[in-house]
Amino acid sequence: MISLDSHESILVATIDRNDQNTIDDSLVDALERILDEADRQQSVLLHLRSVRPHFCGGADPVRVRRWLESDGAAALTADSSRWSSLFERIEATPTIVFAEIRGNALGAGLGLALACDLRMMSTSSRIGVPEVRVGLLPAGNTIRRLTELSGLVAAQRLLIAGDIIDGAEAHRLGLSHWLSDDNSLQRDAAAVAQRVAKQSPAALREAKRLLYSASQESRCQTATIERQAFSLLISSEEPRQRIEALLVRLANRG
């Protein structure tokens, strides 16, 4: 599901779950093990990438179906809390986490990308939070990260208008640090990883800690409000109908 390759102080983690690399418990488990390994090796940089056409297409449809069952509100809240914990751990680890993003980074997949310290996107990447279309909200404190990184106006475009944007526009809005074309993305990302890894490990750890320390309290408050909103939405008929319609469309695609 995730292969590992170490290059001196760089740990390269390549996701290979399915074409969309959708998130379920097994992928979260694998990502947590990767973070454990980065801690064990005291890696300076964790380079997260995909061998599939897409970085991460969001929640797995099997998990979404689970949210519509009789105890679905509890299941959704549990999934959201677990994803939030994973994303917060990515922020908290002293290792610099760098996402190389090609293809889709949607919903929780965008949340995963935004939790990383550094991002490089291909020009053809597709970025968005389509959850509102089906009566939900993006999980894992994604709304706050999106607003912090791109500003309120851009966040409104993605969240309220439901815009799906390409990598070039995401880069213009401040959601990626670097932009590359599809053919050179892997090479360009490797070069950035090597450049970062040459920095002082001690200075990088302290720089990361200071960058995130100021907003930690407000992030915790937002996570609580987010969980309350999920519970309300998944218990309401209109969002449930939209989710059901989405699952039917996905099933019909084969």
Which sequence ranges carry the predicted segments?
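A general structural signal for well-ordered alpha-helical segments in protein cores
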Residues: V28, L48, P61, W83, ...
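Conserved CoA-thioester-binding segment of acyl-CoA-metabolizing enzymes
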Residues: M1-V51, E88
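Terminal peptide-recognition signature
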Residues: A13, L31, L48, D60, ...
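C-terminal alpha-helix plus adjacent terminal tail
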Residues: M1-E8, A38, G162-G167, R187, ...
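Crotonase-fold acyl-CoA enzyme core
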Residues: E88-P201
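Short strand->helix junction
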Residues: Q20-N21, H54, L136, W178
